[in-house]
Every structure is written in C-alpha cells, then in structure tokens.
Amino acid sequence: MALQQYNKFPFFFSGILGPTRLNGLQMPPIQTMVRWGHQYAPRSIRNQKAQKGRVPIPIGGSLRGTQLEWGEYGMRLKDRSIRFHAKQLETAEQILKRILKPIKAARVYTRFCCNVPVCVKGNETRMGKGKGAFEYWAARIPIGRVLFEIGGDGMRKELAEHALKQAAFHLPGKYEIIVKQTPKRLGTTLIHETPITTETSKMNYQEITSTTTAV
C-alpha cells in the first residue's frame, strides 16, 4: 500500500537500488553516478576495504611495465617500491599537463591503477571495533615500473626532461627519465637484451661447465 501511494507522486525518488522518476522520466540508478570522489578511483571494486598488504616484488623475473608503450619519454621508479597516494599522482599529472600545455599535440599517459582502498581510524581510538572508514585510494608501484609517459609532435627533449623532473620532485622516491631505447629494468639491474648466436651460446655453455666442474 505504501509503495502504491508513493508512486502517485511524479517527484518520488525510489532510492539507490532502483531507478528514479522525475516528472515521468526514467533516470539511471544513483550508484552509477558516483565515482568515489576521485578521477583515479576504479569503476568497479569487489570489496570496499582491504588489508594493508605489501608492494609486490618481481622475484620471478617479470619485466612487465618497465618500458615505454605509447609515449616518447617516461618516468620510471628506480630505488624502492612505494605505495602512492592518489592525490600525489594527481598532482604530478597536473604538473606535466601544465608544463606541456603550449604544445598542442602533447599527451600524458598514466601507467598505474589506484585500486587499493585505504581505511583510517581516528586518533586516540581504542583497539578493536572495526577497521575504520574509507579515507583515500592508493596504488602499489614496485621498483622498476613506469609511472608516466609523455609524447607528441614537436616535443623537444629539454622540455620533456624538465617536465618529468618537476613531476618527480613532488613524488617520493628516485626516478629516471627513459626513452624507447632504454633497456628494461629488473629491480636495480638493467637488462640488456643481446641476440642469441652460436658464439654466445658456446660461451654460455663454457661458463656453465666451468662452474659445475669447480663445484
């Protein structure tokens, strides 16, 4: 009976779960309009809270995300793995866009995903009684990953390096400016890819046999 009475009014909003009506017009659910209040927030997430966790280290030898994909210049983390605040990354992106604004064809590419919800409890709070409320989004970036790429027609090398240095100045950690020809990075080691030939294969076989006989 209550729902039938409410449906008589054209200005009735049925809530978050169902569609809304305004003067007889169907509107999408309210949940699809909310994006967690930040541009880096994921579009869909399974759990609203997560454990603190640790930044993964590529101990298996993965080189994914250590080279440029779309841009001509990039900024790569080289000293340690860091959990970044979404606002820190947003500030760095705004700096890049502001410096590269005079170049019409300039573009900024992001290579990270802020999919870690961080929850915070108030100061001087007793132990227990839940994890705490959602505070901000974060991203776990392991060592050797590319964070930003920039590219475009007419971009000079000096301007690109200046923009990336200014963005790195506002982020924690140490970074290196890379180009397309920069070798991949595994932790703190640069991986130089050499073509495999008969001579290199023989040299590797001799090194392996010498080490096994010495043991």
From Swiss-Prot:
Q: Which PROSITE patterns match?
A: RIBOSOMAL_L16_2
One GO BP on record is:
mitochondrial translation
> Pfam families from the entry?
Ribosomal_L16
Which SUPFAM superfamilies does this one have?
A: Ribosomal protein L16p/L10e
Q: Where in the cell is it found?
A: Mitochondrion
Molecular function, one GO term: structural constituent of ribosome
Gene Ontology cellular-component annotations? cytoplasm; mitochondrial large ribosomal subunit
InterPro entries named among the record's database cross-references: Ribosomal_uL16, Ribosomal_uL16_bact-type, Ribosomal_uL16_CS, Ribosomal_uL16_dom, Ribosomal_uL16_sf
Its family?
A: Belongs to the universal ribosomal protein uL16 family.
Name this polypeptide is given: Large ribosomal subunit protein uL16m
Organism of provenance:
Schizosaccharomyces pombe (strain 972 / ATCC 24843) (Fission yeast)
